[in-house]
């Protein structure tokens, strides 16, 4: 019961063919092959040294830098008075 015999795999294969059809299974296997090929290509590209990245030259300012006016240290005076009211 613990091992999968050849008959188990044949039954599984027949069920898969009935559920998905022959066309879907062949498409799936083709997609798996493309994925493996892309993975191998990516691994091969990783081993090759890459060209060094050239940094862009620094940009020089043509206009002087504008600064903001100094922040006031005192708060602005209140424009309206607050009144305590009791709700009746």
UniProtKB/Swiss-Prot annotation:
It is found in: Cell inner membrane. The keyword Protein transport applies. It is a single-pass membrane protein. The keyword Acetylation does not apply. Residues 62-88 are annotated as: Disordered. GO terms for biological process: protein transport by the Tat complex. One of its GO terms (molecular function) is protein transmembrane transporter activity. The chain crosses the membrane at residues 1-21. GO terms for cellular component: TAT protein transport complex. Keywords: Cell inner membrane, Cell membrane, Membrane, Protein transport, Translocation, Transmembrane, Transmembrane helix, Transport. InterPro entries: TatA/B/E (IPR003369), TatA/E (IPR006312). It comes from the Bacteria. The Tat system comprises two distinct complexes: a TatABC complex, containing multiple copies of TatA, TatB and TatC subunits, and a separate TatA complex, containing only TatA subunits. Substrates initially bind to the TatABC complex, which probably triggers association of the separate TatA complex to form the active translocon. Part of the twin-arginine translocation (Tat) system that transports large folded proteins containing a characteristic twin-arginine motif in their signal peptide across membranes. TatA could form the protein-conducting channel of the Tat system. Belongs to the TatA/E family. This is Sec-independent protein translocase protein TatA. It comes from Methylobacterium sp. (strain 4-46).
